[in-house]
A protein has these predicted regions:
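Glycine-rich anion/phosphate-binding loops
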Residues: 51-58, 84-104, 129-132, 176-181, ...
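Glycine-rich, proline-tolerant flexible connector loops at the mouths of alpha/beta enzymes
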Residues: 81-85, 109-136
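Conserved, mostly hydrophobic/aromatic
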Residues: 77, 103, 107, 153, ...
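Conserved anion-binding
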Residues: 79-83, 118-121, 166, 178-239
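N-terminal accessory interaction module
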Residues: 1-65
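Alpha-helix-loop-beta-strand connector modules within alpha/beta enzyme cores
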Residues: 68, 123-152, 161, 188-199
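Structural preference for beta-strand elements that scaffold enzyme active sites
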Residues: 30, 72-76, 109-112, 149-151, ...
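Catalytic beta/alpha-barrel core
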Residues: 130, 147-155, 169-180, 215-219
Length: 239
């Protein structure tokens, strides 16, 4: 498998075949091509087909109301008792809602609400508890801020479905659908967005000698496989 990485060109004067990445302000005129068995090499953008180049220079067309012309900031709302920050404050549901609304006022573009800690060593939380923690918060934030874009941080399809019904529009799954085989079906059913993450094992054991042959290429291969599975389930790349 070959992976192509734009080589950024900050010195535009005199450079040939300059292109902007996804219609933004960053320019490039070459790719670093990386393969597992052949290492990497640099080629000019003129050496690739125009249709392939379009994937890098076309402006993203999100179906989620996100503007990719600027930096997007995600505000994180940990509705868990063992959060390194939120949990230590012993917030009530009302306070979590207020904090979420303040994050939106401060300029966050996506509000990520999670009811299960997935830090290294964390134990799994029952779906019923996770639902109890996040659904009321999501509903009340959407009532006060109807245009807010909310993601739910969960590995479980039933939690994702309840959150989408409550007003979330994105599922942020650290397991990329590996933990719950029904996850992609729920995302497709509700035409939601999905954020695919990488991890080895479960939070309980993720730090017990994780092994990679090539950490970058292993992660790229993993995410490529998950993207293909999501698409085969009916989830558009635009989501």
């Amino acid at each position: 498998m070959q992976y192509f990485f734009p080589e950024l060109n900050y010195l535009q004067t005199g450079a040939e075949h300059l292109h902007t990445i996804n219609g933004g302000n960053t320019v490039f005129n070459s790719f670093r091509v990386t393969e597992r068995t052949k290492g990497s090499r640099v080629i000019s953008t003129s050496d690739v087909k125009k249709e392939f180049l379009k994937k890098f220079i076309s402006k993203p067309n999100s179906k989620l109301g996100l503007n990719f012309d600027t930096t997007l900031v995600m505000g994180v709302l940990n509705v868990t008792p063992d959060s390194f920050y939120d949990g230590e404050q012993s917030f009530s549901e009302k306070q979590f809602v207020e904090k979420g609304l303040n994050l939106l006022k401060d300029g966050c573009c996506i509000l990520d609400v999670g009811g299960e800690s997935t830090r290294p060593g964390a134990k799994e939380v029952a779906s019923s508890i996770e639902i109890e923690r996040v659904i009321g918060v999501i509903k009340k934030i959407k009532q006060s801020a109807p245009s807010a874009i909310i993601s739910v941080d969960t590995r479980k399809a039933i939690v994702a479905e309840k959150a989408l019904q409550a007003g979330a529009s994105i599922v942020n799954d650290i397991s990329a659908g590996s933990f719950d085989g029904k996850m992609f079906g729920v995302v497709a059913k509700y035409k939601a967005g999905v954020c695919l993450m990488h991890s080895q094992g479960l939070p309980e054991n993720m730090q017990n000698k994780p092994h990679y042959e090539n950490v970058l290429l292993d992660i790229y291969d993993y995410l490529k496989e998950k993207i293909a599975k999501a698409e085969s389930t009916g989830i558009s790349r635009k989501r």
